[in-house]
Amino acid sequence: MKVDIHARRFKLTEALRHAVHREITRLVQGVGAGITRVSVRLFDVNGLRGGPDKGCLVHAQFTDGSSIVGSDVDDDLYRSVPVAFEKVLRSRRMDRARRHTLRRHHPGAWPNPA
């Protein structure tokens, strides 16, 4: 799995990098194998002016060809990171449940995941 973490308009600290890696571990444990790439963008829209403008955008790509994007903006980046990852995890679970239901009720309607 490839992991790509970038911070825009500020320096990526070791604590933030650790927080992102912790969430990547939770994501892998939550969806199992099948993640090929995770790109994380951390950003601060207003820079030093402050405000609820710090955000995290997560783009996860999977072996079945699908990809999911989750994002969150908050005044605290350490709160934004887990929320964005949780959105990706929740979307992946809903997608897998939807595919499972389609295969069960309409065999052949949805290609089997790789």
Language-model features and meaning:
Residues M1-A114:
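N-terminal, polar/charged subdomain of small-to-medium soluble alpha/beta proteins
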